[in-house]
Amino acid sequence: MYQRCFDNASETLFVAGKTPRLSRFAFSDDPKWESGHHVHDNETELIYVKKGVARFTIDSSLYVAHADDIVVIERGRLHAVASDVNDPATTCTCALYGFQFQGAEENQLLQPHSCPVIAAGQGKEVIKTLFNELSVILPQSKNSQTSSLWDAFAYTLAILYYENFKNAYRSEQGYIKKDVLIKDILFYLNNNYREKITLEQLSKKFRASVSYICHEFTKEYRISPINYVIQRRMTEAKWSLTNTELSQAEISWRVGYENVDHFAKLFLRHVGCSPSDYRRQFKNCFAEQEILSEFPQPVSLVG
């Protein structure tokens, strides 16, 4: 038997009216997943590594996350995520927005120059259970639940991550700055990957030679500008294949290819299987039994 009573004294962590809201949840179990560099302008991502090893590049720094590690990628951070080839990762991600901790900027959770990857400590089992619940409930909900329920998840996770990262290791040097021009080019490609983009267009827009752009971009991001665009398109195509019922032709058009056959050939070349095979393998219909077998039996948060 145990009972604990609480007084009415409250500690306000958030600025009034600035509590977290959930904008996106993602579950990734593709053993060859590689996102490519990208940016979220208005979201902060809270990531939980369920199993395996994931590699994160965040603002020029490389971090390796293992099972039961938690990761924070704040809005505006240039980042890339890749599953380890030898120990593929399964990850869960909640993207939050609209929150502001006391004394911090909007959507900022980390202390300045904090390491964004740590082992989950305080509330570890609760974090695991919350992500498990979202993995089970969301695929079955079909918008039947109110947004307040999802925001309750966001609120709880934000506080748990905040408490875990409060004393995380901090680097005195802070974040390494990349070449500003090359970073601007990547931001442009990230935001306009659906458009027809040529090296000549980039050269004219950014007033730099084609050879300079190709050399410096490839040196910085280990991929050429054009292959980055292709990778970005393939990443979006994967999400559409596994989370929508859109036809291949519609997906092809949405990611920037007018010719569906050309899209299918590129997908096969870069992903290693056809779009239809990828959809069959990773379609968002994972069985609840598979999830529950790897997590503790969840405590139901809904009646």
From Swiss-Prot:
PANTHER family: ARAC-FAMILY TRANSCRIPTIONAL REGULATOR (PTHR43280), ARAC-TYPE DNA-BINDING DOMAIN-CONTAINING PROTEIN (PTHR43280:SF17). Residues 200-221, 248-271 bind DNA. SMART domains: HTH_ARAC. Residues 183-281 form the HTH araC/xylS-type domain. It comes from the Bacteria. GO terms for molecular function: DNA-binding transcription factor activity; sequence-specific DNA binding. Keywords: DNA-binding, Transcription, Transcription regulation. SUPFAM superfamilies: Homeodomain-like, RmlC-like cupins. This is Uncharacterized HTH-type transcriptional regulator YdiP.
